[in-house]
């Protein structure tokens, strides 16, 4: 009988060497034997559990293929599919959103929950830039619907992201927004036959520049939809990622009123008074209160975390995580993975996992760490709690003791109230993923810390306060936190 190594077999079966060794150690590969530290496997042996694996793959479409199993931080759908990287199939979201019939939709989810990747996926599916790119979707859920084949690559799509917009002044932030808008214009300019436009339309097109004023910038996307509708005969789709980033920058740096005025005008022109708009989808972390920027948008469908719409489209379900862990030989860790990274609730789904932490955990081959909690600056959360009242600090103590809080709050976040109302702080902590809803009755929410990863993050923050020389921690009971604090 001929034999081959577990590494060779792993390549043949398109799984990791760790997975093959796991099967060998559990007696799931007939005829396999260990010599020293190396497993030897019969050449002709069948892969164990193939039928069950395929059943799960069809049901949950968790794919870990190619030489590189996990792509950490890649938010480009085309790149993931082209390079056969780790991808949990979320393409049914395309069908769900399209069949909702909503003209303008806002979806809020915590950071690192696949918002950008899902918008990239929508762009690849609908955009004329990806015409005849069925290869990106073959074998995925959406491609099982033959009626959707004719929609692929059919529409002009304006894909704009505010994710990287940073600045300490209104002018600096506006300039970065302008750069993003210019890039979208240039992308279309490279494929449009400008001779088909009137002289006035070409002049309007040319007015878009990095130094355009706020009024021109606020009308720029509306202008582009008009031009694209005339050119293609299909009303464009607008995809706007991280819509709330400029507003957060405005809050941090004290130009809130100017930014609210601009974003309100931008939204009104682009999404309300725009007869050339086909569909629009916006994503963000927070749901800014309606009085700030959404007062004129009566037609927007807001899908917040408690909404039952698109419950599994962002983040990983428990089954998706289980299958993913099994494919890389880490299934034995599933209970601890649940303790660390589970706990996010969207609608009625209470078993949603943080995808960033899961992919980092797999990439690190089973090392537990606060991956998600370390991906952004927690300065705002830390500052607000540090400056908060004694009651707020006591509430944090209760949460860290594993208790639940009964609070009244609004999922719409009013930044103007953050330093004055504790309910606004709870709204922020919930929107950003640090708290989860255990129960909801009208405006009363039963809240608790999301998971162990979040608990460790908060204990680290508070421990740093104790090491500081000021009195910001004065209302905390030092002993309780230092005794239970988890080492960084």
Which role fits each region the language model picked out?
Residues 21, 25-26:
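Residue-level detection of the helix-turn-helix DNA-binding "recognition helix"
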Residues 62-488:
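Phosphate-binding site recognition
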Residues 1-19:
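Polyanion-binding surface elements
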Residues 28-55:
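Short helix-start
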